[in-house]
C-alpha cells in the first residue's frame, strides 16, 4: 500500500526489494481497461524508491540480474517491475484472463506439466 511504500522510501530501507509481476491482466479484464498500471514506476520513484524495470520477467537471467542490482543498490528500497506473460509456456493458459482465477482439471494439469517439461529440455 502507499503508506508502506512511503515509509520504506522515507526510512531508506535499502534491504527491501519489492517485486511487481506486471502481466497486465486481472480478474475482470486487462489492467488498461480496469485499472491502469502504466505509472507504477513513477509512483515508486516519487516515494523514494530505486526502480529496475525488467523487459522480460519470464526470463530468469533478466530477473537474476535485476535482483543482483537491487542487492548492490544502497540508500533506497528497490522495486523490480517485471513485465511478464501470465501462464507463459502453457499453450492454453498463456495470456488468458480466465486463468487469473481458473482451476485446472487433472487433464489440463498433465498437459501443462508436459509442456513445461518440454520447454526445459
Tell what function each PLM region has:
Residues 1-121:
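Glycine-rich ThDP/TPP pyrophosphate-binding loop and its adjacent helix/strand module
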Amino acid at each position: 500500500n502507499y503508506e508502506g511504500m512511503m515509509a520504506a522510501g522515507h526510512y531508506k530501507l535499502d534491504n527491501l526489494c519489492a517485486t511487481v509481476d506486471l502481466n497486465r491482466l486481472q480478474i475482470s479484464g486487462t489492467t488498461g481497461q480496469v485499472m491502469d498500471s502504466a505509472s507504477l514506476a513513477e509512483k515508486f520513484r516519487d516515494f523514494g524508491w530505486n526502480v529496475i524495470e525488467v523487459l522480460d520477467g519470464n526470463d530468469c537471467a533478466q530477473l537474476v540480474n535485476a535482483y543482483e542490482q537491487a542487492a548492490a543498490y544502497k540508500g533506497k528500497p528497490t522495486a523490480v517491475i517485471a513485465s511478464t506473460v501470465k501462464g507463459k509456456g502453457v499453450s492454453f493458459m498463456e495470456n488468458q484472463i480466465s486463468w487469473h482465477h481458473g482451476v485446472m482439471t487433472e487433464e489440463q494439469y498433465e498437459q501443462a506439466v508436459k509442456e513445461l517439461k518440454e520447454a526445459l529440455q
